[in-house]
């Protein structure tokens, strides 16, 4: 019972820290990740959590970018290789590879397989770019203080897109 209480305390503390990070001016407000050689940002309200890649059960007759399903704490999540979905190379499952669980508020039950997590990014360090959106899932584009290009993922548009929802061959 003590382990459950400790886990709950940890989750409450983490939730409070994330809320403070969102409300603080110039604080980290977007999760950075790397997929297909590109840097992506995800709004914290649209991300569930980032976890190491668990065992994934393949699904027959599925598109190449659909990895299969994973059991995460008793819940089944469909796993999409984000790089392959975008038309790039398949993501190698390494020690750095991660699954980004999409927020439960979308009721999508899905996770994106990405190359690695790049941590939280401060809004004050990102300069909006004038360039048009590269895909219908790109909300905005930014450049950081080091000149690196970032694309912000539009999660609601992604999880409602018919192409994303159709995993059968």
Where are the predicted features?
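An acidic, low-aromatic, low-complexity terminal/linker signal
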Residues: 1-169
């Amino acid at each position: 019972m003590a382990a459950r209480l400790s886990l709950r305390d940890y989750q409450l503390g983490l939730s409070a820290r994330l809320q403070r990070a969102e409300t603080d001016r110039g604080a980290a407000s977007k999760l950075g990740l790397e997929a297909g050689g590109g840097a992506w940002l995800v709004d914290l309200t649209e991300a569930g959590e980032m976890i190491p890649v668990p065992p994934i059960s393949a699904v027959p007759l599925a598109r190449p970018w659909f990895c299969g399903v994973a059991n995460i704490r008793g819940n089944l999540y469909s796993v999409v290789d984000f790089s392959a979905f975008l038309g790039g190379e398949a993501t190698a499952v390494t020690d750095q590879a991660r699954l980004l669980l999409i927020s439960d508020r979308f009721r999508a039950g899905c996770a994106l397989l990405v190359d690695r997590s790049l941590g939280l990014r401060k809004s004050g360090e990102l300069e909006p770019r004038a360039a048009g959106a590269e895909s219908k899932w790109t909300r905005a584009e930014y450049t950081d203080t080091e000149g690196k290009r970032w694309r912000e993922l539009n999660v609601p548009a992604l999880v409602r897109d018919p192409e994303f929802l159709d995993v059968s061959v």
